[in-house]
């Protein structure tokens, strides 16, 4: 936090800090906690004892670098070594060795892990916090029924409910419930202890009758009753130790372990003083919960809001990694026990290193990062996407909710989200409200809660102090909203300000305020904070904008925005795509692939990223920004990354736009653009595709990589080198061979060529045949080969020894069908590219670059794009850049409009262009039709907007099929571009054809053009000879499939075909 002249200001925390803190907490605390839980292992005769000495464990520095791990598809991990001892109790000897436990994947500087060469990230999960929660529901008679739900650390739930007679029941499943007295007795309390520990003993005494008193007379009877209700399948159980163990395993371990957080919550809610290390549910907890429930029945106490963030906890990367480490140690324990028993059985002398295997830990983490729903492949479309992905929070995942069962109340915005979870940034579709994004200043506290910073207002001290509050603490304070940040301190005593108190938004005097917000962006996520004039947009459009900025493609020539919010620099810095100087010094040498820095007597070579492919096929590239001989300081930018300029985020381009209709080409969100954007490479981007092939060892022999491929034209093999692999720099077209490969196979005698059969008969030479299994370039993949990698995994399986990867770069200009969007949810598809001379032009002759539909603004209520458009024009003419904080109306009324108009007026005066600011229609100007030169009827809003090109491109979506594969069951074309699928005539298409009465077209669409196998084959022959296509004589395959499916339901369907010649009904069997 800054002091003195900048008192009251703070720096924004690192956007990847949550991931770093979580991983450091796992390494510092989680590893040690789980290792301490590892038990001493003894054999059955208790002669050998194995134990780990966890105080001196070691994590070894990785043997490979991050770049090599990605290149060779390896895991960037550290080896874990722990001293272990094997004690022989008979001779009192101990053998101590350092054993290798396994590999733990490390986190890199981006806050991600590299597993099998793929960047993966673990996102935070929001779960219901363990503890007890009271709620009230109306029964069918309209009477309030009070229940208390106890949630364990594992997510198991048990309910306490009170009936009309004030009797309390414990419901351990949906169907079974038992008396609270039976449950307390089964947990170890007698009736006297129960009555001594409750506030309403007379109510508890009224529960049991004589039969129930017998059940709670002893602990054995209570356990039998509880077991019979909860776990018994049938018969009369008999009390035994095995019965107690089964009940302990089925019920108490799953539903009664509260954990560290649950114990804290239970103590706070029920005013208990049970020690924190006692993490299991005790009879005292149950009785206190029952007392509280009785108080609820009598109108005392408050109900709990299950959706309040104080009742939620964050399962961070530290918790998830610690859970997996504990699971791996349990597997290791079982493996060590089995190895000890096997060694003794075979009379072998074990050693610690022989007993411990690294497989459990390594395989557990590999399966976690590869299969767990919360471990996701890092989205690297652009720099913004990388940092936003690590700050996601999800209600989904193991132990959480599902998209189909979550209610609207859970998805909705809650007042406790203020400053913690962004109210705007969430996914669209079925997961809306379930996957959110953390606010900029939010952090995860020690107890798994989301904390938000506030400035404390103190009359005694003039110093401003920043405090982080959890959701349970800030309810007790009057918190002033962010608009009070700009008020003059001298007038504040007389001001009335909006504030938040106990989930309500009030307007109170300044002297009653306890805390105030620290930053106007405090409530928003990173994506929403990059939207200028966000306060003038509808929240739905702001949501779309924050999502679409993550889909922006890095352009070949990036340009920073004229109108921004000021967070562009921080976002680019924390994304890690720019090269930053770690030491001060002098630039000795600079090149496209490295920068050499000299300082303090050392020379450091800093490698740059060159044309690296992201997992969304976008191009990641670094461009040097320093010259040779220049002196730099620590933290200075050496090279810009993809979509950054001068260390600022630059996702799009500032283009001249007009809001007007144009011959219908921009109706319904279509966009008309100038050919200047194509020929000037304004929206040109590079995309890198990866194609790979593996060589296997088959039963007939190994596959061969070669350039001698029989039966293929030389034209297709023109780009292969002598090894059979495509050469670097080659231009590749669809269908060309990238890697030549032959797979050996045995052939039948009849399939041999005559000369091969002669060789076999005369000389006895075995002629080997091979099948061509080359890697060919698929449709739409044409481009330039920029990299070829031949990877041989060390110690790999002989069945998969080699892998060849070919990387092909495509240069894509903007074209009809591509999707573009602004930063205000204004998206559209390119409908037509006009010559620049036909585009509307301004009064100074400048042609417009894009034409948007003005009808897309009022109905969608995203007026922020108009402010940005006009201010961008003023900034372009004045050569200025603006950084606008949101909610600038806190300074004065209509502050945004006054700013825009004043800048337009300044631009009009300085450039001597009166059309820039016309008083009768400010922000609008008369423009001319490029085809005729005539002015349009009405003035039009023109300006400079920051427009993004999105990853939804027509080259990836357009698809056509002349012939292809058919589904085996229905005999209809497959579905989807990836399978070379086609269209099929469905139910609604048939209705459309029937509506026009086109009987013959309907027949051919449903028979030989679709799934009639025999008629489909006859079409080709009759077309070649020029005959007429015969009408099919039987039913198509889909109808036959319907008949068979009805038969499987024991329904026989007979059908009849009517002949055209004599209208005679002929019965046919399907």
UniProtKB/Swiss-Prot annotation:
Protein's UniProt name: DNA-directed RNA polymerase subunit beta
Which locations, inside or outside the cell, does it occupy?
A: Plastid, Chloroplast
A GO molecular function annotation here is: DNA-directed RNA polymerase activity
Subunit (UniProt): In plastids the minimal PEP RNA polymerase catalytic core is composed of four subunits: alpha, beta, beta', and beta''. When a (nuclear-encoded) sigma factor is associated with the core the holoenzyme is formed, which can initiate transcription.
Which terms does the UniProt entry file under GO BP? DNA-templated transcription
- Name where it mostly resides: plastid
| Species for this entry | Liriodendron tulipifera
**Cellular component terms per the entry's GO annotation:** chloroplast; DNA-directed RNA polymerase complex; mitochondrion
**Recorded catalytic activity of this chain's protein:** RNA(n) + a ribonucleoside 5'-triphosphate = RNA(n+1) + diphosphate
EC number in record:
2.7.7.6
Q: Which keywords does UniProt give here?
A: Chloroplast, DNA-directed RNA polymerase, Nucleotidyltransferase, Plastid, Transcription, Transferase
Q: NCBIfam families attached here?
A: PRK00405.1 (NF001616)
Entry keyword Transferase: yes
């Amino acid at each position: 936090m800054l002091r003195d002249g900048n008192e009251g200001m703070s720096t924004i925390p690192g956007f990847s800090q949550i991931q770093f803190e979580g991983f450091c907490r796992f390494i510092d605390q989680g590893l040690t906690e789980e290792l301490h839980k590892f038990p001493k292992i003894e054999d059955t005769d208790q002669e050998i004892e194995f134990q780990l000495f966890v105080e001196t464990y070691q994590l070894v520095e990785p043997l490979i670098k991050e770049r090599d791990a990605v290149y060779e598809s390896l895991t960037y991990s550290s080896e874990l070594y722990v001293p272990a001892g094997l004690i022989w109790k008979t001779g009192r000897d101990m053998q101590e060795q350092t054993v290798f436990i396994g590999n733990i994947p490390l986190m890199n500087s981006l806050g991600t892990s590299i597993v099998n060469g793929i960047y993966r990230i673990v996102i935070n999960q929001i779960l219901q916090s363990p503890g007890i929660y009271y709620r009230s529901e109306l029964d069918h008679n309209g009477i309030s029924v009070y229940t208390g739900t106890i949630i364990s650390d594992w997510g198991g739930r048990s309910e306490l409910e009170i009936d009309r007679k004030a009797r309390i029941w414990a419901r351990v499943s949906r169907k079974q419930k038992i008396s609270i007295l039976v449950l307390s007795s089964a947990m170890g309390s007698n009736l006297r202890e129960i009555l001594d520990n409750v506030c309403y003993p007379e109510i508890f005494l009224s529960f049991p009758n004589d039969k129930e008193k017998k059940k709670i007379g002893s602990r054995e009877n209570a356990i039998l009753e509880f077991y019979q209700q909860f776990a018994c399948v049938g018969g009369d159980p008999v009390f035994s130790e095995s019965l107690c163990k089964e009940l302990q395993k089925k019920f108490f371990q799953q539903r009664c372990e509260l954990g560290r957080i649950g114990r804290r919550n239970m103590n706070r809610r029920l005013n208990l003083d049970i020690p924190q290390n006692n993490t299991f549910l005790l009879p005292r907890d149950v009785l206190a919960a029952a007392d509280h429930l009785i108080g609820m029945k009598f109108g005392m106490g408050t109900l709990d809001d299950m959706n309040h963030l104080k009742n939620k906890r964050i399962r961070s990367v530290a918790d998830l990694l610690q859970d997996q480490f504990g699971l791996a140690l349990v597997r290791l324990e079982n493996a060590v026990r089995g190895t000890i028993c096997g060694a003794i059985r075979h009379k072998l002398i074990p050693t610690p290193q022989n007993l411990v295997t690294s497989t459990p830990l390594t395989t557990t983490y590999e399966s976690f990062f590869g299969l767990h729903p919360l471990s996701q492949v890092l989205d690297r479309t652009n720099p913004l996407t990388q940092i936003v992905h690590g700050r996601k929070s999800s209600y989904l995942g193991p132990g959480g909710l599902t998209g189909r069962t979550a209610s609207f109340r859970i998805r909705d915005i809650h007042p406790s989200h203020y400053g913690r979870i962004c109210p705007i940034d969430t996914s669209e579709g079925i997961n809306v409200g379930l996957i959110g994004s953390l606010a900029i200043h939010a952090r995860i506290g020690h107890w798994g809660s989301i904390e938000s910073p506030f400035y404390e207002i103190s009359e005694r001290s003039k110093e401003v102090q920043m405090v982080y509050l959890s959701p349970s603490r800030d309810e007790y304070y009057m918190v002033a909203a962010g608009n009070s940040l700009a008020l003059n301190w001298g007038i504040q005593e007389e001001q009335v300000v909006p504030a938040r108190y106990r989930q309500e938004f009030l307007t109170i005097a300044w002297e009653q305020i306890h805390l105030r917000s620290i930053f106007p962006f405090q409530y928003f996520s990173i994506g929403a904070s990059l939207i200028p004039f966000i306060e003038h947009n509808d929240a739905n459009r702001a949501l779309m904008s924050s999502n679409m900025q993550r889909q922006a493609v890095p352009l070949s020539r990036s340009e920073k925005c004229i109108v921004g919010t000021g967070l562009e620099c921080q976002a680019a810095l924390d994304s890690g795509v720019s090269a930053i100087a770690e030491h001060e010094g002098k630039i000795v040498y600079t090149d496209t692939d490295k920068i050499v820095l000299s300082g303090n007597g050392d020379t450091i070579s800093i490698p740059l990223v060159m044309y690296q492919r992201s997992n969304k096929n976008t191009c990641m590239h670094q461009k040097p920004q320093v010259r040779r001989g220049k002196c730099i300081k620590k933290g200075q930018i050496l090279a810009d990354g993809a979509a950054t300029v001068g260390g600022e985020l630059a996702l799009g381009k500032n283009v001249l736009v007009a809001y007007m209709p144009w011959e219908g080409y921009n109706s319904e969100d279509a966009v008309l653009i100038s050919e200047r954007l194509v020929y000037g490479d304004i929206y040109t981007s590079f995309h890198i595709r990866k194609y790979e092939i593996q060589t296997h060892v088959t039963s007939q022999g190994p596959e061969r990589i070669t350039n001698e491929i029989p039966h293929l034209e030389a034209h297709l093999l023109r780009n292969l080198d002598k090894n059979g692999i495509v050469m670097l720099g080659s231009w590749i077209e669809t269908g060309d061979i990238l890697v030549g490969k032959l797979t050996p196979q045995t052939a039948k005698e009849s399939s041999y060529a005559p000369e091969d059969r002669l060789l076999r008969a005369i000389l006895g030479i075995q002629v080997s045949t091979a099948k061509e299994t080359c890697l060919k370039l698929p449709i739409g993949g044409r481009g330039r080969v920029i990299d070829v990698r031949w990877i041989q995994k060390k110690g790999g399986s002989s069945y998969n020894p080699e892998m060849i990867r070919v990387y092909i770069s495509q240069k894509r200009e903007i074209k009809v069908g591509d999707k573009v969007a602004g930063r205000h949810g204004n998206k559209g598809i390119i409908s037509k590219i006009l010559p620049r001379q036909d585009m509307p032009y301004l009064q100074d002759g400048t042609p417009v670059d894009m034409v948007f539909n003005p009808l897309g603004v009022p109905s969608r209520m995203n007026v922020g794009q108009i402010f940005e458009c006009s201010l961008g024009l003023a900034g372009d003419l004045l050569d200025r850049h603006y950084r606008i904080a949101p909610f600038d109306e806190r300074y004065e009324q209509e502050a945004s409009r006054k700013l825009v108009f004043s800048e337009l007026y300044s631009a009009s005066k300085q450039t001597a262009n009166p059309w820039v600011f016309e008083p009768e229609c400010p922000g609008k100007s008369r423009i001319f039709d490029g085809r005729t030169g005539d002015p349009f009827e009405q003035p039009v809003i023109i300006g400079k907007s920051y427009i993004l090109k999105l990853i939804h491109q027509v080259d990836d979506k357009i698809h056509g099929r002349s012939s292809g594969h058919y589904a085996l069951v229905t005999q209809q074309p497959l579905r989807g571009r990836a399978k070379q699928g086609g269209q099929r005539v469905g139910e609604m298409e048939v209705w459309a054809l029937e509506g026009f009465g086109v009987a013959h077209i309907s027949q051919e669409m449903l028979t030989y053009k679709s799934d009639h196998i025999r008629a489909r084959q006859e079409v080709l022959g009759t077309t070649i000879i020029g005959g007429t296509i015969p009408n099919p004589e039987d039913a198509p395959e889909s109808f036959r499939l319907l008949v068979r499916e009805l038969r499987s339901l024991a329904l026989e369907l007979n059908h009849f075909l009517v002949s055209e010649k004599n209208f005679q009904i002929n019965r046919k069997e399907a």
